[in-house]
């Protein structure tokens, strides 16, 4: 994932036939803190965690990343495979499926939006047993979402939480439009807008406001997670990292939001 984004807001373009076919195939078959390059601390060419016989804490062949840095590198490598059309679709084999009947040890929790264009397992090229995925429109938090996120680190020692926003987020767009017009949205959708509203960037106008608010919302959600005492204790002793990131629909790049 890239550390910082220099490009301004770009409307999402219609996917090409090749991309649509790839998405269908993936769905049916189925970065620590770098500067200017990938989400991982290692350079953009860094390889994913090397396969080897099953390691302690795993039930299948690929070694489970056990530190925040390893987890970030694996996500960065997976996103690189995705955006360059070199997906490996890992951890889908019959032996993996069988091994997972005895337990799971995902190496990252990804809190993402419900948007159908941003499925975490695909954009990070991961497979069964690799990720806890928690999805709510605009990455909005409530008690159920918080509990779902905390389960990985607190119960299974998952070393990484990623708050993943994305370009052209409909929930953020709706929240900004409701704020500007004063129009109330249907009941449950209004709740989402109310949660996003404090993060609206009023220093920008038009599409730039939506774009900036997408990033501001990710930062706010990440900060709230980092303030949770049980999670903060794990961050403090190095067992956990909580990072914000953003997926660009036009380039398929995931980059870090500082």
Annotated model-derived regions:
Residues 39-82, 88, 92:
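C-terminal segment of N-terminal export signals and the immediately downstream linker at the start
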Residues 88-146:
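Conserved beta-strand-loop surface patch within small alpha/beta domains used
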Residues 193-241:
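Polyanion-binding loop/helix "lid" in catalytic or ligand-binding cores
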